[in-house]
Amino acid sequence: MKEIKDFEKIKIKIASPDQIRNWSYGEVKKSETINYRTLRPEKDGLFCERIFGTTKEWECYCGKFKSVRYKGIICDRCNVEVTHFKVRRERMGHIELAAPVAHIWYYKYIPSRIGLLLDITASSLNSILYYEKYVVIEPGDTDLKKMQLLNEDEYIEARERYGMSFNASMGAEAIKSLLENLDLDELSSKLRIQMIDKDDKTDKKLLRRLEIIENFKISGNKPEWMIMEVLPVIPPEIRPMVQLDGGRFATSDLNDLYRRVINRNNRLRKLLLLNAPEIIVRNEKRMLQESVDSLFDNSHKRKVVKGSSSRPLKSLSDALKGKQGRFRQNLLGKRVDYSGRSVIVVGPELKLHQCGLPAKMALELFKPFVIRRLIESEAVFNIKRAKNLIEQEVDEVWQILDLVIKEHPILLNRAPTLHRLGIQAFEPVLVEGKAIKLHPLVCHAYNADFDGDQMAVHVPLTPSAQAESWALMLSTNNLLNPANGHPIVFPSQDIVLGLYYLTMEKKNTVGEGKKFLNFNNVILAINNRSLDYNASIYVKIDGKYKKTTAGRVIFNEALPNGIEFVNKTLSDLELQILISKVYVVHGSSTVIEMLDIIKELGFKYATKFGCTISMSDIIVPDEKKAYIDRANKEIAKIQNDYAKGVITGEERYNNVVSVWLKTNEELTNKMMEILKKDRDGFNVIYMMADSGARGSRNQIRQLAGMRGLMAKTSGDIIELPIISNFKEGLSVIEFFISTNGARKGLADTALKTADAGYLTRRLVDIAQDVVVRIEDCGTINGIKVETVKNGEEILESLKEKAVGSYSIERIKNPITGEIVLDANEEISEAKIELLEKIGIEKLVIRSVLTCEAEHGVCQKCYGRDFSKNKPVNIGEAVGIIAAQSIGQPGTQLTMRTFHIGGVAQAGSEDDKISLKNTFILNGIEGFNVRVENGILFTRKGTLKIINVFYEEKIKNIKEIKVSDSQRVIKGIPLFVNNKGVEILSSYIGYVKLRDDKFLIVSEEQEVSLKAGTKLEIEVGEYVESGKVIGTFDPFAEPIIAEVKGKIKFKDIILGTTLKEEINTETGNVEKRITDNVFESLDPRIFIIDSGGVEIASYVLPGDAYLQVEDGQNINIGDIIAKLSKGSEKTQDITGGLPRVNDLFETRIPKNLTEMAKVSGIVQFKSIQKGKRLINILDEYGVEHKHYIPAGKHLLVRDGDIVKAGDMLCDGRINPHDVLEILGGISLQEFLLAEIQDVYRKQGVSINDKHIGVIIKQMMKKVKIVAVGDTNFVYGQKVDKHTFYEQNRKVIEQGGEPAIASPILIGVTKTSLNIDSFISAASFQETTKVLTDASIAGKIDDLRGLKENVVIGHLIPTGTGMGLYKKIKVSENVNSEV
């Protein structure tokens, strides 16, 4: 027998009638199933033994032959073959239909495939198939046209008029003959000519028709096979019928659907034999068509066929579709044997590689192994006795179980398994009771806690499975998080608290200030109680006395040898840094040893510390009242400004919210300060939060500060905060306001978890076939990486960005010229430090985004595997790792609201600008005007600054060894000071000699400023760090006069473009430009000079508040109008997850901006149809039109110079525009930055390469814009590699290649367009995918993981890769080389 695993590809086609008859073992003629008396299948029925095989093993139906020795004989009485009953799972039957029937997949699904081929609409097709209208097949020499539809009356009239000279009929027969008459080659060339004529405006329908025709041509399917003459009957075991206890039968819905088809078919046969009237026959044919439709797809019909309990019957399509369908329920999600589940409890005594397995559970799981050992040890001689012994649980059984379990790993899994660390291998240790014991340090990877969580246990059976569990899945081999390379096994909670207590320092305690010669003496002193754990002491280390504490000595004494002395108070972050450091320096074995020591110590000293918290530990600052009074005064002032009409309602609201956020922040800082001083830093609440063991600053703020601002149901912030804290107690109204946030948190958590899970599923689906397949793709392209900054603050260093990647270019030391980093060399931590030392801030590295491997990626472009901190192995499933790395935090982020209980969080904006570093202002860019005491930026501007790293007065210098403006790196001699000491540079930068100072400064940097910023410093000024250099209004964007003159309104008409609102609270009149768009009206303000000449014009966007009157005089710098920023909403990942979704689905954002298509000069034109036309004149004098909705706030003015890709108005950027205007690389950078931004705000670190893998998959296809001599169709979307391959062939033959442009496709769409139809079908829209695949005769190369899981092969990654399958063990050891 041929091994089922011997195939490498799967092809899907439409089955021809002959093929169906070929599969069949006989025709099903009756609709009976089982005889109710004998309970045996009826002859020729749906369960007939003659067709489908015997129901009893090795026995025919009548019982004449009963034994395996008659195997293969067909009984002469009952015609049943003597065989195994399992054949009833694989033998098919068929039904010969009395009239042809159309297959619902090909005519009903939109777009209708038959409709496209014949070019008729779906409704016309339906009317033909359901016998409502005739269609002309051959017009003969009449006036009728081919494919013309005739109703009953028209048909009779035509027959009377033309007699039999034309051919018209209805039903599936008519469609079948039309399909038979199609000449696909002729049709294809006709359509291609039409496509070329249409050129740019490709008709989607034309493209679809062409694609379908090409698919039929290539696949060898015949169009008429979409109409069925023979119906296959699937094997009976797949649609079983079983007897229930009460004697009734439960049957699969398919049997009911088949019965209806057979009954109607038999009735139609009889009617045809009887030559019944046409109308009756027609009705019966229509009913047959309907019954076959419901058999194939019942849910897709208007009138669904219902069963006895009026629930729709499950048809063949429904059995494939959805979560409960064949693909996802039975093929991708099988249940496995040798598994069990139980509640987990903590096992602090376990080693990192162990887990506790309940003895009863172990006995059940390892039963076959125990039975084998029992028989081998000759305690029993057959399996039955062995089972009895096991049930009696005799001593021998337990002894054998111990032997069996030794070094047999088991897998532990906790649902939801969000990333690969959700399943890890452990060595089992037998424990009493019924709960699984879990090591406390692996909880983080599983996201497990011990409040009733359950875990599943699986037993790997074969030696190779056990070897893989040991080598790859053991918990000690999974110390690092694959998403970012940070440790994922680290202490938390009690352990952290214990170590924090142990390593803290306390003043005035027993034994303070003593000196000790070695660690042992310290431990002796502690045991004799003459020394306190927290006492500050001196200990001799490496021949020198070092100031430390007794506790730290204990901690260091316990650590493995070779780790340098840790002399600080250990919080959770410090511990993680320590673990990382030890991992890099000493490797994993030392870390594993250290982790278990840390766990022991932590628990031990947490117990000794025995901390408790009481109300007296919660200290409310005495200054609280003063802070709140001050806030109330500020708010009164804001209210007063509002009453005078100085600020708008939105600004007032934003300012009030800002005041409370600031007050809360200050109060919290004060409170933390007091807690820190309380009991010399031993206030337990402070210790818990500071160590990171439990609780956060945010939670303590609610206990001892104030609860703060709360959010309304809408997400807006209520401007009156909850001033009380939990210690003081909340008033009734405060409590009531709190409830909404708390409830919302719980509801959100439930909804968002599903969202994040679905995101992960889509990502896995798009990236599942990305595997590292080759070592080097040989690309010369790479991407630029540099430090990510937000102003002064470094968000992500060059090290985080580039470490573990390979360099594209060779980098030399700018001073010595020696090669520091060669091309194609891995960038290690040491190399990065070297590069930073010589001042390299940008690198071009190889990236998955630019990898040119045909399938998957190559080792060099992927770089380092973060879970191992080594270069990635060939065969690593990097696509799935990427999907998990992005999806897993998504699920975590959704849980955020849950813990803080709905307290509003929004960044409070300051209205002052100051920079952290000392700097020199080199220059300014952007429109600005001089006003008294400063410079006012009328639009967005930029400061060009150079930071000052180092300064020394020249009078203190004896000799300068460098020249002005020279670039220096660390370690270069700068000067000799007056004391004769040579000073070396500890910075990278440029020398600047200024007045009486010697400076080292940075390269020029840019700081962007908002419109309306008033700058209070001059160009060239030397500015100390922290000095306020300017102010701006954070809650409104002003439109500012740049010239002096008189105001003149244009198209500002009260009631049309201008709305006057009387504010009910203040009685002031607010003038607001409406955001309704009028065809011809374009509200503007002109400034005219004394001669009435227009010298400036300002376009007013919708919702702008006017600050001037018509005819009023205006000075430079006065505000003409202002735009309020929308009210503050709370920033939560609720904003984050949908944003990530939109980016991955490449949805066009709602509030779109328009980007400049080219670089050039802006020219304002008229408003047409509610859109403003803006032309950009490029350098060749060509005008490029841009249409912008009229109410939008413009970011450019007439005559401005813009660069391609600049935003012309405010709004969100559309990724498709980025691709079109700036190209593929810019789009990749844009998507990467946007997605990272969402995660970074939540404090989640994901390496760029994971997001890169997904973006690479989204940009896999190109769109054909010129066909050349290839077989492509204009406007068709094809895979990049297919495109290059076809072009290569055409060029070799001297033809003209096709031209294509890159496109971006969202993840869902990409998953459905994936090459593998099995993978796409198991994702979504199963029936549609299979319909298209069958027409195209698609071949699945079984390249991805999913398709191999579905058909039961090993997945082609890791050890299952083709590369490793061919490895043979050689017998001959001493063979000649």
From Swiss-Prot:
Positions that bind Mg(2+): 449, 451, 453
InterPro entries, alphabetized: DNA-dir_RpoC_beta_prime (IPR045867), DNA-dir_RpoC_beta_prime_bact (IPR012754), RNA_pol_asu (IPR000722), RNA_pol_N (IPR006592), RNA_pol_Rpb1_1 (IPR007080), RNA_pol_Rpb1_3 (IPR007066), RNA_pol_Rpb1_3_sf (IPR042102), RNA_pol_Rpb1_4 (IPR007083)
Subunit structure: The RNAP catalytic core consists of 2 alpha, 1 beta, 1 beta' and 1 omega subunit. When a sigma factor is associated with the core the holoenzyme is formed, which can initiate transcription.
Recorded GO CC terms: DNA-directed RNA polymerase complex
Keyword Repeat: no
Coiled-coil annotated residue ranges, if any: none
Keywords: DNA-directed RNA polymerase, Magnesium, Metal-binding, Nucleotidyltransferase, Transcription, Transferase, Zinc
Transmembrane parts of this sequence: none
UniProt entry tagged with the keyword Zinc: yes
Enzyme Commission number(s) from the entry: 2.7.7.6
GO MF annotation terms: DNA binding; DNA-directed RNA polymerase activity; magnesium ion binding; zinc ion binding
Binding site residues for Zn(2+) 1: 60, 62, 75, 78
List of residues binding Zn(2+) 2: 777, 851, 858, 861
Pfam families to which the protein is assigned, alphabetical: RNA_pol_Rpb1_1, RNA_pol_Rpb1_2, RNA_pol_Rpb1_3, RNA_pol_Rpb1_4, RNA_pol_Rpb1_5
Cofactor note: Binds 1 Mg(2+) ion per subunit. Binds 2 Zn(2+) ions per subunit.
Organism: Borreliella afzelii (strain PKo)
Reaction catalysed by this enzyme: RNA(n) + a ribonucleoside 5'-triphosphate = RNA(n+1) + diphosphate
Necessary cofactors: Mg(2+); Zn(2+)
SUPFAM superfamilies according to UniProt: beta and beta-prime subunits of DNA dependent RNA-polymerase
GO BP terms, alphabetized: DNA-templated transcription
Protein name: DNA-directed RNA polymerase subunit beta'
Family to which the UniProt record says this protein belongs: Belongs to the RNA polymerase beta' chain family.
Described function: DNA-dependent RNA polymerase catalyzes the transcription of DNA into RNA using the four ribonucleoside triphosphates as substrates.
SMART domains linked to this entry: RPOLA_N (SM00663)
